Amino acid sequence: LGAEAVQIGTRFCVAAECICHENYKQKIIKAKDIDSEVTGRSNGHPIRCLRNQMSREYLRLEKEGAGFEELERLTVGSLRNAVIDGDVKNGTVMAGQIAGLIKKEQSCKEIVEEIMEQAEKLMHC
């Protein structure tokens, strides 16, 4: 058994080359390990995001039994609002659990090199 792939989107969101708004990057960099939550479980479209006004409202509506259409209306355009416009309070800030461990912006080259160095160390243990 072994890993065949990894999903590292959150790490690359804060890469120097990434076009994500600086507010989005900083929200991830400042995140703690307990700052993410999963929304969308009730409608079969779960996503992990960082807590903010949008996610709290979404979870409240979900808990109250809101339907797919109502939840969809709330979130239409919200990812763009966060990623492109930088509205990290009312937009959806998608990020994995790893967000709490990301503490700085790096180039893609630095990220890949760091991952490879860590993998090599682990494989030689």
For every predicted segment, state its role.
Residues 1-125:
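Conserved active-site-proximal phosphate/metal-binding subdomains
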